[in-house]
Amino acid sequence: MNAPSIAQDVTTVPVSLGNRSYDILIGKGLVDRAGEELAKRLKGVRVAVVTDENVAKAHLERLTASFAKAGVDVTPVIVAPGEKSKSFGTLETVTNAVLAARLERGDAVVAFGGGVVGDLSGFVAGIVRRGMNFVQMPTSLLSQVDSSVGGKTGVNTAHGKNLVGVFYQPQLVLADTEVLDTLSPREFRAGYAEVAKYGLIDRPDFFEWLEQNWQEVFSGGAARTQAIAESCRCKAAVVARDERETGDRALLNLGHTFGHALETATGYDSTRLVHGEGVAIGMALAHRFSVKMNLCGIEDAERVEAHLKAVGLPYRLSDVPGGLPPAEKLMDYIAQDKKVARGALTFILTRGIGQSFIAKDVPPAAVLGFLKERLETK
């Protein structure tokens, strides 16, 4: 079978997973070309487009027109915006909507939104009829560079974030960089935390490039597409090595152990903290904790903080509005982290910028003492 032809102005990043490999297409105008791109790959399918109220208002009409032009029948399923939609209740609502539309296993669920919509929709696609086709159309910077790639899906519980879900790969990812122009500055900054993360994991050259070019990434120049594509390449390489997070893939959680604890502590209240902001603080804390453990030089931790501060991201616990619970309570949330194995704490720590590693059996007393110190740091 011949590979589908792709417009010249679109960057393609392959995700190599054997017979479950797929492409990430990155460029402007992909919302208007979505019907054409999907019809090339999944002939004769009907789709449920899962989106949130904000994205629906801004972009759904264009997307449904694109599908109609390609002869693709669409059932829109609209959920409330925000982290609170990553719940069992919303999962049931969306599942019932897909079943009510009589969509079959060979049809597709299309996630048209940010990370919440993508995680929720992928879970639905993975469990309805034991697995439907799945297409990611991420509309936030965070979802374009991170959550839409690699097949992680799921919902939150009262015990913590992303504790229930499945690995379920999409057949296609369409990342329209034009829709990022409609994001609020705060949403864009939050997504940028995940971009910076790739440099901090194992690409010091990329982090240095971001330090020099972040303003053009924010303003929407060619550097934006370059940053998104490079981030996707970084993630695709890790996912190809370790799809189900039994080893290296855990590196992608740099900043997330602390960050998820902060999200849980703030009740997933987006007026106080959104995911990318939690990750930004978490990455700064991971570097500071690495300094405390004599793994990393103070100058690298300060460089990370300086960059986060320059782009307008929070980097201290005191940056979380409304205060935080005591260190002991934060430790309770950390103990629920997915990377905990046989009760031992696992963190992604670093020996310097671009030198992150998986640290197992991290002493809880050291983490507790560190959190107490940072809670007192203004």
UniProtKB/Swiss-Prot annotation:
It comes from the Bacteria. PANTHER family: 3-DEHYDROQUINATE SYNTHASE (PTHR43622), 3-DEHYDROQUINATE SYNTHASE, CHLOROPLASTIC (PTHR43622:SF7). Its EC number is 4.2.3.4. It comes from Brucella anthropi (strain ATCC 49188 / DSM 6882 / CCUG 24695 / JCM 21032 / LMG 3331 / NBRC 15819 / NCTC 12168 / Alc 37). NAD(+) binds at G115, V116, V117, G118, D119, T139, S140, K152, K161. This is 3-dehydroquinate synthase. Binds 1 divalent metal cation per subunit. Can use either Co(2+) or Zn(2+). It is an enzyme of class 4 (lyase). It catalyses: 7-phospho-2-dehydro-3-deoxy-D-arabino-heptonate = 3-dehydroquinate + phosphate. Catalyzes the conversion of 3-deoxy-D-arabino-heptulosonate 7-phosphate (DAHP) to dehydroquinate (DHQ). One of its GO terms (biological process) is amino acid biosynthetic process. Pathway: Metabolic intermediate biosynthesis; chorismate biosynthesis; chorismate from D-erythrose 4-phosphate and phosphoenolpyruvate: step 2/7. HAMAP family: DHQ_synthase (MF_00110). Zn(2+) binds at E194, H256, H275. It is found in: Cytoplasm. Keywords: Amino-acid biosynthesis, Aromatic amino acid biosynthesis, Cobalt, Cytoplasm, Lyase, Metal-binding, NAD, Nucleotide-binding, Zinc.
